């Protein structure tokens, strides 16, 4: 077992809203060459994404993880580098950053309709294969984490609108309802 994969069971107890999605993220990411993660918090999903990227057959694997707060994780960076993954952290607001093209875009930022709608509108063209979003079911699927002034509430309406507006390019691959929800969109 790789070092990145061996960390997942150890951090799972600290990731109660995410740990059940570790295998899904790891397996999905194994088919990718690059990942951009928006919204890092404690780094739970970042470890799972890096563990999947490590399995990729690509020789040029990279990961960019960003958050509005300083969530840089030196241990993650060390393990990812040892696994042959170029990794970078940026402290920035996901609504005001130019992202590079990537295989997989992972979104777990502020849980409001307005935030997710803006992020999807701005960044969906950068994801070449998948867009993955966490917290798409209870409690944030249908209510906002904070009042953002938008008429709609929660992440799920933003996803439904996005899919309606982008039928020619994106479709729902899978919606998990456990651990606050995980939604995977795949490029058509």
Predicted regions and their residues:
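A short alpha-helical cap/connector motif
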Residues: 1-188
